[in-house]
C-alpha cells in the first residue's frame, strides 16, 4: 500500500521593480490600472503583484512568488494551478507504511 504525504513551504521570494505609470497608478499593460496597495495576479507564472509607493513618490510593483524547492528523490513535483499562493508547486512523496 502506498499513500502520499503533501507538504509545502509558505515562504517564497519578493522583488520590487519598475512598472509603467498612468494617472499615478500601476499600469501592468493588462488593460487595468491599480492604485497603491491594490493587488493583481499572474496565474501563469504564479505571482502576486502589489502596486506600492516607491522612492521619492514614484510607483513600483512588488512581486511575490513561490519558494524554490530542492529536488527530492522518489517524490513527484506537483503544479496545482490556480491563483497565488494555491498555485505554488509542492512535492508528493510516498509515505512509508510500517
From Swiss-Prot:
The keyword Mitochondrion does not apply. SMART domains: SVWC. The keyword Disulfide bond applies. Its main location: secreted. Pfam families: SVWC (PF15430). Belongs to the scoloptoxin-16 family. This is U-scoloptoxin(16)-Er9a.
Amino acid at each position: 500500500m502506498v499513500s502520499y504525504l503533501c507538504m509545502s513551504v509558505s515562504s517564497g521570494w519578493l522583488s520590487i521593480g519598475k512598472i509603467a505609470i498612468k494617472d499615478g497608478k500601476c499600469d501592468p499593460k493588462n488593460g487595468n490600472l491599480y492604485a497603491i496597495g491594490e493587488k493583481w495576479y499572474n496565474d501563469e507564472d504564479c505571482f502576486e503583484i502589489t502596486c506600492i509607493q516607491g522612492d521619492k513618490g514614484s510607483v513600483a510593483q512588488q512581486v511575490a512568488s513561490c519558494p524554490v524547492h530542492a529536488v527530492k528523490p522518489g517524490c513527484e513535483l506537483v503544479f496545482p494551478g490556480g491563483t497565488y499562493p494555491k498555485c505554488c508547486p509542492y512535492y508528493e512523496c510516498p509515505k512509508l507504511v510500517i
